[in-house]
Amino acid sequence: MNTTGSAFVIGASGIGRACALAFARRGVSGLVVADVDLQAAESLAAECRAEAGSAGTADALGCAEATRVDVADERSVELAVSFARRVLGRVDYCVNSAGIGVKLANEIADASPVEFEAMFQVNVKGTFLVTRAVSALMKTQDPVPVLRDSPGRGTTRGCIVILGSAAAFAATPKMVQYTTAKHAVLGLTKSAALDNAAHGIRVNSVCPSWVDTPMVRRALQDVPELEQTIRTSVPMGRIALAEEVADAVMFLCSPGASYATGCNMILDGGTTLTTHLG
């Protein structure tokens, strides 16, 4: 099922980039991309316009604009959401993929309190601020039919998809800051889904394990033993493509997922299915 309506994507690289391009291909009526790096957001918006042209959806994509956001700053988030509302008129889909990865991999006895705090500022507080602001916006929007030829699906004011992690289900050695933050995001997703359900707003998360993104590539450079850990822990024998995660996000945004809220979709090539001994 295609996604119509307008989309607000936070995060201009990796999974966020893949989601924005997927929205452009699928014919959204408008798109706003936000990132702490405004130049990256502007570049992605231009790429989305070109992608819509190549996919034959340029007529549907009325606009693709960019703005800056620091998700850990309340005022910055409010300004970005206001920009999206002004440009798009309404936000039907919000995908929040902003986040940071581990820089210092240590056992808990040697873990950095500074990095722990930084991880929570972006990955937890940032997720909270974005979900809070977008929920408030969507509550003011008129409900629209989920699918006109299937009235039993009811109406919707919008949906939010948060990028979680398989680390919310299984811990990774020497990554206490990331594992703890992603467990918090899991709880936030469930709480937001419960609070928003009566307003016709769905909230879900996608929880991948290792994905081929710039953040993971940096982690592989910073933590030499990580590559072997990945190779031995993923039953499918490879890491995910960002496009594969975007496909899951598109499903959760689509009418096909109209009864899904509070879900935390694990997308990990089987990583969390078993323990790994030896």
From Swiss-Prot:
Pfam families: adh_short_C2 (PF13561). The active site is at residues 178, 182. Keywords: NADP, Oxidoreductase. NADP(+) binds at residues 15, 70, 132, 178, 182, 211, 213. SUPFAM superfamilies: NAD(P)-binding Rossmann-fold domains. Induction: Expression is increased in rice-extract medium (REM) and is correlated with the production of pyriculol. Its EC number is 1.1.1.-. Pathway: Polyketide biosynthesis. One of its GO terms (molecular function) is oxidoreductase activity. Belongs to the short-chain dehydrogenases/reductases (SDR) family. Short-chain dehydrogenase; part of the gene cluster that mediates the biosynthesis of pyriculol and pyriculariol, two heptaketides that induce lesion formation upon application on rice leaves but are dispensable for pathogenicity. The highly reducing polyketide synthase synthesizes the heptaketide backbone of pyriculol and pyriculariol. Pyriculol and pyriculariol contain several hydroxyl moieties and double bonds, so it can be assumed that several reduction steps occur during biosynthesis. This is Short-chain dehydrogenase RED2. The lineage of its organism: Eukaryota, Fungi, Dikarya, Ascomycota, Pezizomycotina. The gene is RED2.
